[in-house]
């Protein structure tokens, strides 16, 4: 094998020390410990500076933005909730006013229709009263006409009956008196 890659015992140049002993783990070697500690300190300081100056401000700004956005969203939600509550109150107020107006319009319409129907009823009653009076006059006139015709018919019938039964022609004046007396008795 090539030099530095190992020997027959499997030891390598990196791990074998003089005298055939294995060398300690490189970070624990006494002669390189101080330089490794300085390197660690430099790396830690560099990492600390990078993290504190670059990474943490970015993370902090993201967290601040997120917190601000949450606060803004919460404030907007509160504002919108207030607006929706106000809108709901306004809607309920408008609805109550609309109901009141509808009831007032309904009552007014009902009163107007009742008044109109009452006026129409009175007008119809007056017309019916006039027609009834006219009908009563017509009936009275028809009755008088009929009664005058009845008197004539009764006189003719009585004359015919007397003539049929007795064979004599009755006296007109006596017949008229008898018919008048009979008709007056039936009207009373």
Curated annotation (Swiss-Prot):
Subcellular location: Cell inner membrane
Region of interest (Disordered), residue spans: 1-23
Alphabetical list of InterPro entries matching this protein: ATP_synth_b/b'su_bac/chlpt (IPR002146), ATP_synthase_B_chain (IPR050059)
Key words of the record: ATP synthesis, Cell inner membrane, Cell membrane, CF(0), Hydrogen ion transport, Ion transport, Membrane, Transmembrane, Transmembrane helix, Transport
Membrane topology, from the record: Single-pass membrane protein
UniProt GO cellular component terms: plasma membrane; proton-transporting ATP synthase complex
Residue spans of biased composition, Low complexity class: 8-18
CDD domains (alphabetical): ATP-synt_Fo_b
Chief place where the protein resides: membrane
One Gene Ontology term of the molecular function aspect: proton-transporting ATPase activity, rotational mechanism
Protein's UniProt keywords contain Signal: no
Regions crossing the membrane: 37-57
Pfam short name (any one): ATP-synt_B
Function: F(1)F(0) ATP synthase produces ATP from ADP in the presence of a proton or sodium gradient. F-type ATPases consist of two structural domains, F(1) containing the extramembraneous catalytic core and F(0) containing the membrane proton channel, linked together by a central stalk and a peripheral stalk. During catalysis, ATP synthesis in the catalytic domain of F(1) is coupled via a rotary mechanism of the central stalk subunits to proton translocation. Component of the F(0) channel, it forms part of the peripheral stalk, linking F(1) to F(0). The b'-subunit is a diverged and duplicated form of b found in plants and photosynthetic bacteria.
Family: Belongs to the ATPase B chain family.
Subunit-level organization: F-type ATPases have 2 components, F(1) - the catalytic core - and F(0) - the membrane proton channel. F(1) has five subunits: alpha(3), beta(3), gamma(1), delta(1), epsilon(1). F(0) has three main subunits: a(1), b(2) and c(10-14). The alpha and beta chains form an alternating ring which encloses part of the gamma chain. F(1) is attached to F(0) by a central stalk formed by the gamma and epsilon chains, while a peripheral stalk is formed by the delta and b chains.
Name of this protein: ATP synthase subunit b 2
């Amino acid at each position: 094998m090539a030099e530095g890659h190992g020997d027959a015992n499997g030891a390598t140049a990196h791990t074998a020390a003089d005298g055939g002993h294995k060398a300690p783990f490189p970070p624990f070697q006494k002669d390189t410990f101080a330089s490794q500690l300085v390197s660690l300190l430099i790396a830690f300081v560099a990492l600390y500076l990078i993290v504190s100056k670059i990474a943490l401000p970015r993370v902090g700004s993201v967290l601040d933005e997120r917190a601000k956005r949450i606060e803004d969203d919460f404030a907007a939600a509160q504002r919108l909730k207030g607006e929706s509550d106000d809108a709901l109150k306004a809607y309920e107020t408008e609805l109550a006013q609309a109901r009141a107006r509808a009831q007032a319009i309904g009552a007014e319409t009902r009163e107007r229709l009742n008044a109109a129907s009452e006026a129409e009823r009175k007008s119809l009653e007056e017309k019916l009263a006039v027609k009834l009076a006219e009908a009563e006059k017509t009936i009275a006139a028809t009755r008088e006409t009929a009664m005058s015709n009845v008197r004539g018919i009764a006189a003719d019938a009585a004359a015919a009956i007397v003539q049929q039964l007795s064979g004599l022609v009755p006296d007109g004046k006596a017949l008229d008196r008898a018919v008048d007396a009979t008709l007056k008795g039936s009207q009373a």
